[in-house]
Amino acid sequence: MDMMITGLYGTYFPVSEMTGKIPCFDSSTGRIFKDLGYDTNFFYFGSSAWRKIGSYTTSQGFNKSYGMENIHNKQKSTWGIYDNEGFDFILESLDKHHDKPTFNMILSASNHPPYDIDTKKYYNIDTEKIRNFLDTNYPKEKRFQGITPEILTVTEYSIKSAADFIKKTYESYPDSIFFITGDHFDRSYPDPDRKIFTSTSIPLIIYGSGVHKYKLKYTAGSHKDIVPTILNMTAHAGYKFHSFGQSLVTDDINENIDKERIAIGAQSIANGRYIFNGGGNLNILTTKKKMKMI
């Protein structure tokens, strides 16, 4: 998460927990988008006290930072506000303050232990169907430790909540662009034979206005490349900014995809063909096996 907020390389030392006053780095995301004229907001569906994320994000250029304590009259789980309730709050906030463009960074919280979300209250998610899928493809004796149908049910709930928010927001603000990613790899993946790709990678999904004008430039990237990608698609021509990353897309349809460019993450390095975790383990990236859906 630090890399997305400060633009610095990711390490296992949380910048937010440093003692003393933290400077606003030139590469900080909030600072850059504020410079571009955006109203910058950070939303976290858990407590703002977690890793001091409330004061941390405002110190890095976000105009406002919202935590669960700012989101009133919404259903809460052990970890924080229900994802769909938090997304509703954000949409309400956008409707109240639509007089200028906004940049909004959102960190949801429902997909965390103890997975105590009342999913049936909001979505008709069939837990038994998920249970059958697990039993068919990953019998208990061959399943990664602790993975249960309830965990995957909450995962599906979180996905549906985000999808609903994107749909509603895009209908109200059709010039919006959404960048969907994770702050860490998927810990609920049931396969016990976890390759480096599974245990270190995250997705990046780009959806919205004008996305069709761009094509993939590199096959491998990391968190540090996401903000440069957003800026490539939204900032005015010639805008200069500080970053350790590069845009992952290009508007030059004739440019070939670079499969050799190396992406550096906190736990691994990779290009379009290989991924290495620094511990002597090298994986060749291949197509995953097909699974039977129930």
Named regions from a protein language model:
Residues 1-294:
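Solvent-exposed soluble domains appended to multi-pass membrane proteins
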